[in-house]
Amino acid sequence: MRAVITGGTGGIGFAIASHFGKAGYQVVLADLNQQLLQQKTAELSSQGFTADYCVLDVTDQQAIDACARRFPADILVNNAGIQHVARLEDFPPEKWALLLNVMLTGPAMLTRAMLPSMRSNNFGRVINIGSIHAVIASPFKSAYVAAKHGLLGFSKVVALENADKNFTINTICPAYVKTPLVEQQIAAQAKEHNLTEQQVIEQIMLAPMPQKAFIDVSEIAAMAAFLCQDAARHMTAQTLILDGGWTAR
């Protein structure tokens, strides 16, 4: 069983890769930085896992097609993500387009490229890493929220189109996870609001979460692994929310 994971060298992606490696899957890390890919792949291999890598820009259609030809996936994890925070009138159009390309068009085109082999083998699992912002909104994140909301609609359509096969597509939507991307947001918001980083964590990020704790990458990895199991074969087009109670408010 081969799993291709975009954003595979990052916090969430690498946690999923490690979990899948322990489960005996062949893991393919897909990301931009070749040196980091080689380092992380070697780290997986040193633990006895079967691992490889693919240098991939998810906004590059030729690169997407090449990755799918070289590593046709049984399991695809669309995890690559970026962020930009600004009021809409201050949002650079090219930055808006980039966020949509990375987090909506990229997953769509990579899923499109992987579908023929999945359908041919009568097995496919697509796992999108969404966000709490796929189901709620926050100011200054218009492009991110639009992309993540779009991912849910996209997944429902693909689920319907492939319901004749042993194929599922689902989206895991965590609240804030302590990853390098979130660390950057903490620093940026501390500067913008003249707060300490701890104040940003307590007063902004964890304030809406009744459990007052970051989601751990291991929780997301475990949920992704469950979605690949036969026990989840009828779970498709679903939005799985890990938010510490945020959406119960």
Where are these regions (language model features)?
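Active-site loop immediately N-terminal to the catalytic Tyr-X3-Lys motif
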Residues: 89, 136-143, 164-165, 212, ...
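Conserved glycine-rich cofactor-binding loop
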Residues: 9-10
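Short, small/polar-rich loop/turn modules that mediate ligand/substrate recognition or access, typified
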Residues: 163, 168, 235-237
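C-terminal substrate-recognition "lid" of short-chain dehydrogenase/reductases
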Residues: 115, 123, 210-242, 247
